[in-house]
Structures are given as C-alpha cells and as structure tokens.
Amino acid sequence: MNSEKKHKKKSKMERGLTNRHVQVMAIAGTIGTGLFLGAGRSISLTGPSIVLVYMITGGFMYLMMRAIGEMLYQDPEQHTFINFITRYLGKGWGYFSVWSYWLSVVFIGMAEITAIAHYVQFWFPSWPSWLIQVVFLTILGLVNLIAVKIFGEVEFWFAMIKIVAILAMIATGIFMVLTGFETPYGSASLTNISEQFSLFPNGGMNFVMAFQMVFFAYLMIEFIGVTTSETKDPRKVLPKAVKEIPLRIIFFYGGALLAIMSIIPWRELSATDSPFVTVFELVGLKWAAALINFVVLTSAASALNSTLYSTGRHLYQIAHDSPNRFLKSIKADTLSRHNVPQNAIIASAALIGLAAFINVLPGVSDAFALITASSSGVYIAIYILIMVAHLKYRKSKDFMADGYLMPQYRLLNPLTMLFFIFVFGTLFLQESTVMGARGSAIWIVAFGIYSQWKFRK
C-alpha cells in the first residue's frame, strides 16, 4: 500500500514524444475527417465562399490556441489546459470544465468509432458494427497503454496518410488546371470558381449554417498543446507547433477546396458524395472510392487514438483533483509501469464503446449528428471559459511578460469569445443538430449551477 502511494506521488507521465511526432501531428490535427467526406455538403451550402468560412473559423481557432499556448508556455508541466480554468476562475468552473470536457471528448470518440464501423463496412458490409468497434477500441487502447512513444509513432503515420492525400488532391488540381484537363463538366479552370461568383449564392442563412459544420472539423485542435507537454523541451516545441497553424489551414483547407472547385464547377458537386473520390475518378483512378475510404478510415482511427490519449489524461487529472468513490475504486489516479494513466484510459474506452447502443436509440435518426451537436455545444462553453481564464492570467502574478504572448489580446480575446457564441447559435438552425444543441445547453446551465454550488457549500 505504501509503495503504491509512493508511486502515485513520484511518478510522472513519460515525456516520450519527439519534435518530429508533434510537428506532424500538429499539421494533421488541423485536418478533420469532414474535409474528405463533408466537403461536398459544405460547398453545396455556400459555394466558393466556403473557403472564407474555413479561413474565418480557422483564424479564431488559432487565436484560441495562442491563448492556450501562452499559458502552457508559462507552465509547461500541465498535461491539460483545463487546469488553467481551475487556477484562474476557481474550483467550481474547473470542476465544470474538466468533467464537461472529458464527456464531450468521449462523445467525439463515440462519433469516431461509429464512423470507423461505417468505413470498414465499405469492404465488409456483413460485419456487425459492434464487432468492428470492439476490435478498433482494443487495438488503439493497447497502443495508448504500451507507451507514449508508441502512441506518437502510430499517430505520426496516421497523420502522414492524411497529409499525402491532401497533397495529392492539390497537385492533381494544379496539373488539371495548367493542362486545361477536360472533364464531363468542362475544362478544369480557376474560372469555375470566379465565374458568376457570389458571397451568398444560396442565401445568407446557408452561409451561416456552414460555420457549425466547419467548426466541428476543427474540434480537438487544442490537442496540439496537450501533446507538447509530453515532449522533452515543450517551450521549444510549443511555439513552433502553434504559430504554423494559420499556414496549415490556408494551404491544406484552402488548397484542397480550391483544387476541387477548379476541377468541378461547384454547382455540379454532389452534396452526398466525397469530392475527393469524384476528382480521383476523373483522372482514371478506378479504385478512388476504396482509396479515399482508406484515408478517412485512418483519419477516424487517428482521431480515436488521440481521443483515448486525451480522455485518459483528463480522467487521470479528475481523479487527482476531484476524486470520488468510483474513480478511487478503479484507481484512475495511478500510472502504469510505462508511466501512462492505464486505468483512466481503459475506463474512457469502455464509455466510448457505448456508441453501439446510442446508434439504435429509437427516435434518433442521425446519431452522428446528435453526438456532433452535443459535443460541439459543450466544447464551445469550455473554449469560452479558457479565453476568460486567459484574461485572468494576464492580470495575475503568473503572467510571463517575455513568454509566448497572444497578440492584441484585449481586442482579439473578446472577439474570439463572441465568435464561439455565434457558432453555438448556429447549432439551433438545423433540424439534425438542434436536439444535441438543446441537450448541451441544458447541461451547461444545470451542471454549471451544480458545480458552483458544490464548491460554495
């Protein structure tokens, strides 16, 4: 018993991630699976101006990362940015945030494992969804349990697949435009974008609705900051990983979307089919659908892998800061001999596995949209709280004047919060997301009040 207590106190999570791991994960971390599958749907909403939606949303996510990065740079020992909410806003908001964030990431994990089963059934339609989910959860769970170095290596190669796929799309677009490649839709040309351009071709409301779709593509971008804490030199790795986010967004999202719309006039794009598949089939790649399915499968597996990493560390933090009988019974506050939060990862994986039951709930026709909306709403509340915590940090004795500072924070911090509130409002505009939005709103109010009451007793 004494040796176990000693182990709890002295053990620290392994700093096994290298700069190579973090930089590639940082690139891939800004690229959501939605780009490969949902680009057609988002383009159909608002045409070429979808690029503007991606740039605006990406810009505000970058500003949030600058706020998180500034605080992590000052205290690189933190393994979760939620600790800054506790430190600067109090235990009540910290309790609300750490549980809400953990649950919202679990919801995202449920969406990811649901998607993985769908992608595998592309090749094996007779395989039951629950079996696919169990197999992937087990494999990726083991990856997270062995050592953080193994997690980093697996994520590195998952990330490379996404990056290569987008580079191939951009290169294909450049080649087809330069050669005037003829397709059934006409010649590949930039005029497919510029001709009869309108900022709101389908009305202002569709432009507004595109923001919540794009926002979900960026969720968990803060994972970039979390991973840097498990590198040997976080103060060197963190600024480089964060400051390159805008260029990555412009190049990968902007480049891919412009390439797609240059090849195929946007009004001809299917809202349901992947434009990546369509483009690669145009250049004669008969197995394009299988190729893109493989890319999105590895992308979803990468996201689930990161989710297990994140939820395990956040539950470990909860077990330390706000222990309860259940967390004590599963020893969620202990590390394995590999210095990873083994029990916390297993508990998180078990909860994510409940996705199979959610998918058959009566009355829920679109489980993925329900989970997406719920997690997005709760996520927005956490993002707003971290921005408030950043304002408090700037006025605290912890402020590091020569640190990695967020630029023009007095203006850009409040603007970022207003943008997040705007995105939350868009969740109520679509039938498939309004149920989840209402649920997240009820959670934010009810659990927020309870959390404040709990620490004022």
For each predicted feature, which ranges?
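Membrane-interface loop-to-helix entry segments
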Residues: A117, W130-A188, F215-L219, V242-L247, ...
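TM-loop-TM module centered on a large, flexible mid-protein loop between adjacent transmembrane helices
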Residues: N83-T86, G90, F122, A241-N305, ...
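Helix-loop-helix connectors at the membrane interface of multi-pass transporters/channels
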Residues: M1-K6, N83-T86, E112-Q133, A165, ...
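Helix-loop-helix junctions that connect adjacent transmembrane segments
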Residues: K8-M13, V51, P125-P128, M160-N293, ...
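Extracellular loop-to-transmembrane helix junctions
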Residues: E14, L37-I132, F136, I245-I250, ...
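Membrane-helix boundary/coupling elements in multi-pass transport proteins
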Residues: E77, S100-T114, Y218, E222-T231, ...
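Membrane-interface "cap" regions at the ends of multi-pass membrane proteins
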Residues: M1-G40, S44-S49, M61-R66, E77-Q78, ...
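C-terminal membrane-solvent junction of multi-pass transporters and transport-like membrane proteins
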Residues: F158, I330-V340, I380-E431
